[in-house]
A protein has these predicted regions:
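Active-site neighborhoods and metal-handling regions in enzymes and metal-associated proteins
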Residues: 1-206
Length: 206
């Protein structure tokens, strides 16, 4: 498992290339989504946004398929772990919407899994506070210095500390391994509060 989890330089370069192409598709998606909202598209909903992000990824060179079904959650649906919109359940998306988009692609060179949260209008003070605390957690984790052999369980606290100080939390892991043109969820490493999560986070892991 560890031999697969620790990527070689060819795999790492392929993953960088995959994320560049994925980034193009995601940028196009958010531009399109904001345009639809500005123009007042009343048919805009979670389901057709999921279809749109898949079609934009498919335009990229070396695209194979989705790495998992896209998760598009508007408002309260964004808090449902692994939510999947259907044509019947899909909530409308408007200028007042907070959108969570969790999606990814399988490319010949690598695999992506990207989660982003956007407000399409003017967020409330509480929404800004929550978003800022999550962002501060991302920055704390990204800039953390830790000794060799530190497991993801210990690092998870960096991501949650600013939420905890406000009495907030999220019932989900912070991060998981991603395969190089393989499974989008790859172990044994993860960054989560699970006590059995003792695999050290090592150079070359994604």
């Amino acid at each position: 498992m560890m031999a697969k989890a620790i990527k070689n330089e060819t795999e790492l370069e392929g993953m960088r290339e995959a994320h560049l192409m994925d980034g193009v598709a995601m940028s196009e998606l958010w531009w399109w989504l904001e345009k639809q909202v500005r123009e007042g598209n009343e048919d805009l909903n979670e389901f057709n946004v999921g279809e749109k992000v898949s079609s934009l990824r498919a335009e990229q060179a070396g695209y194979v398929e989705e790495s998992f079904p896209s998760i598009v959650g508007e408002g309260p649906h964004g808090a449902i772990v692994h939510y999947r919109a259907t044509e019947k359940s899909a909530r409308k998306i408007t200028k007042d919407s907070i959108i969570l988009l969790d999606s990814g692609g399988q490319f010949l060179c690598g695999t992506t899994d990207v989660t982003r949260t956007h407000h399409l209008g003017t967020p409330s003070a509480y929404e800004k506070m929550c978003y800022t605390r999550v962002l501060k957690g991302h920055i704390a984790l990204d800039t953390a210095t830790f000794p060799v052999g530190t497991p993801g369980m210990a690092l998870d606290t960096f991501a949650r500390q600013h939420l905890w100080s406000a009495g907030l939390d999220y019932r989900h892991g912070t991060g998981h391994g991603v395969g190089a043109a393989l499974n989008v969820h790859e172990g044994p490493q993860s960054i989560s509060p699970r006590w059995g999560n003792t695999t050290p986070i090592t150079d070359g892991m994604i």
